[in-house]
Amino acid sequence: MKRLLKYGGMAVVLTAVMATVSFAQFNLFGNPLIGKQAAEFTLKDLDGQEWTLSQIREGRPAILFFWATWCPHCRSQLSVLNQQIEEIHKKGIEVILIDLEEGPKQVKAFMDRNGLELNVLVDTDGRTTDDYVIPGVPTFYFIGADGKIRAVEHHLPDDYEKLLS
């Protein structure tokens, strides 16, 4: 039993260290897409309607939020977005939520159950997630009015407007 606890504990610590190094490397070296044009995508919303990035943005700055229903940190960021969405829209910034590889029924049930009134696109095949080099969730991409990626964060910072200029 002691051996199981010892090796089990070591496995947990090793996993935590590897995850920390992965995120630190992402933050230290930056995302290779910063400064580049945001990749165009076509995704469906929860009602099955297709949307493209350019169709939603219409030349405005945008915040892309990659998330998943199973992610506890994503849930807290969804709550923040839900509270601030009107203020963000008043500033002329579009918010695009992209759920990672889950079905629209599952996502809709989650949104309804949690009283979230945000528009969601679903990346069921993972292509958009791959195009945006998502290291983990939650991940926010800040896209300027010119369509270039300005910053990548794992939370919605208070100074998000500065990141978009």
Q: Which ranges hold each PLM region?
A:
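Solvent-exposed loop/turn segments at secondary-structure junctions
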Residues: 68-72, 101-105, 126-128, 156
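Hydrophobic beta-strand anchors of alpha/beta hydrolase catalytic cores
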Residues: 63-64, 95, 140
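Conserved redox-active cysteine motifs that mediate thiol-disulfide chemistry
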Residues: 66-83
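A short beta-strand-turn-helix
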Residues: 42-62
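N-proximal helix/coil linker or "cap" segments that precede and/or mark the start of modular domains
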Residues: 6, 14-40
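Conserved segment of the thioredoxin-like fold in thiol-based oxidoreductases
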Residues: 76, 86-125, 137
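Thiol/disulfide oxidoreductase modules built on the thioredoxin-like
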Residues: 58, 109-116, 123-165
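Short pre-active-site segment immediately N-terminal to redox-active cysteine/selenocysteine motifs
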Residues: 60-62, 67-70, 136
